[in-house]
From Swiss-Prot:
Keyword DNA damage tagged: no
Top-level EC class as recorded in UniProt: hydrolase
InterPro entries per the UniProt record, alphabetical: Peptidase_A8
Function summary: This protein specifically catalyzes the removal of signal peptides from prolipoproteins.
GO cellular component: plasma membrane
Major location category of this protein: membrane
UniProt subcellular location: Cell inner membrane
Catalytic activity: Release of signal peptides from bacterial membrane prolipoproteins. Hydrolyzes -Xaa-Yaa-Zaa-|-(S,diacylglyceryl)Cys-, in which Xaa is hydrophobic (preferably Leu), and Yaa (Ala or Ser) and Zaa (Gly or Ala) have small, neutral side chains
Superkingdom assignment: Bacteria
EC number of the protein: 3.4.23.36
Name the record gives this protein: Lipoprotein signal peptidase
HAMAP family: LspA
Pathway per the UniProt entry: Protein modification; lipoprotein biosynthesis (signal peptide cleavage)
Amino acid sequence: MARTTTLGRGGLLTWLGVALIVIVLDQLTKTLILGHFQYGDARHVTGFFNIVRVHNTGAAFSFLAGASGWQRWFFVGLGLVAAGFIVWMLRSQGHQRLFAWALSLILGGAIGNVIDRLLHGYVVDFLDVHWAGWHFPAFNIADSAITVGAALLILDELRRVRRG
């Protein structure tokens, strides 16, 4: 049986490489935002999209953002536990391509946001989608990767159920 740590198709290192690409893109874009925007700045891009700089001390949709500070370490711990579980899953399920893509995107996004929490105490969000005065909560590349990964997990499960 082939080792799952090889660079071959479906090997653990392949999927960790995908996660690393997400982490690098996420951190690069956040570094650019931190270097060129002040907190609260916004730049109009289109009629439905802005680049902003906001800090999220909570989770998705700023859940628990108003808590007293304990949530920083809670989400760091949760992210690290999730990362460990995902790596374990990739070691055994890396041959299932869609599933592994999904997990790799989620892994990269989770680690990207954990890095922010460790470095800054908050997650840097900067993508602002809006329509007719309604703004979706700002998000970042890591959040996008997690969302796409979750959608791929659902798709993978639907395909698995359909196959019987």
